[in-house]
């Protein structure tokens, strides 16, 4: 993660031929720049402290809950644990160092930390984002291949190793292209003596812009696409499963109403061999017929071998009219007219409706939770990436007076994702929620 002054000084460092003019003209701008957040520094300190503590404690609880159930390892829980660990690193590396640089207007941690800390900040944020992609891919695989789901702990280890390798590889240019700059040499003022700033020093602007665009693609656009595709697939599968469940319950209701008429309607009909054959036929082919507007009529007796040849095609009409005039409802060939449930089927129908309502409520809950996951990621990280892109292409669009304030707002929104990830991936996860509740009770006692 870049420091807030990088874009401002990259242009100054690239114009070394005009150093004298820069010293005379930029010093008043530095004073104006320095006073941009002085009125809000206590508010920023309190806000950063609150966000950091909330993110640290929430992710620490997730780690403790997952460590408690180590005997029930799953790939998703393993990834959620690594997500909590990477979010803790984001809180530890990004919040204190960034806030200190913003409020004190200098880098106080030495030359070595100037090369290491931006690299660690970038790696922690990138790893957290790549783990979100991994969780989305695993969920997509579990939905598309529920029966052949053979993801083991080794697959989780492989995913985590790949994620950390990609994080180190993508962020590897940052230690090379960061340098410590003395402000007295840059601005030519004795008031800025012994003050240093850690800034990016790319060979040219094109390198810096290329790196910013790469981070935008890997840290924002790619995760957003993966989360959207995966969670859309999950919601669609749940919706299809709900539809199949509802259809199956309605079909069972139709057959139960047909096979078990009300006791008030008369004596039970004893099924003959042909009726049993017709019942097995409707069970086998019940999905071909309409669920709510289908009933069954009595099946004709199967003709014997002796009079089979006597049944001529012209007699089919009379047989059909004879069947349609019957008033008994026993298993047979379905026809399309509305069936009215008997009184003794009210309890069964009520159970069916309650089951379908419960499944619909659960599916809506999953849909809302997955939608919130996508929105939280999109809203929290979009301002910071837009800020870096805008300042890299044209740093004059944001005035020096409001530069640090805008950066702090964007940076705090990004940090909020570290506070919300434990809630979205941990506290709303039914498998982890019970362990979290028991853990909180133990800590409270």
From Swiss-Prot:
The chain crosses the membrane at residues 43-63, 78-98, 118-138, 157-177, 209-229, 370-390, 408-428. GO terms for biological process: cardiac left ventricle morphogenesis; chemical synaptic transmission; eating behavior; G protein-coupled receptor signaling pathway; generation of ovulation cycle rhythm; negative regulation of acute inflammatory response to antigenic stimulus; negative regulation of apoptotic process; negative regulation of glutamate secretion. The keyword Transmembrane helix applies. Pfam families: 7tm_1 (PF00001). GO terms for molecular function: neuropeptide binding; neuropeptide Y receptor activity; pancreatic polypeptide receptor activity; peptide YY receptor activity. InterPro entries: GPCR_Rhodpsn, GPCR_Rhodpsn_7TM, NPY5_rcpt, NPY_rcpt. Coiled coil: none annotated. One of its GO terms (cellular component) is plasma membrane. It is a multi-pass membrane protein. Disulfide bonds join 114-198. Signal peptide: none annotated. CDD domains: 7tmA_NPY5R (cd15398). Belongs to the G-protein coupled receptor 1 family. This is Neuropeptide Y receptor type 5. It comes from Homo sapiens. The gene is NPY5R.
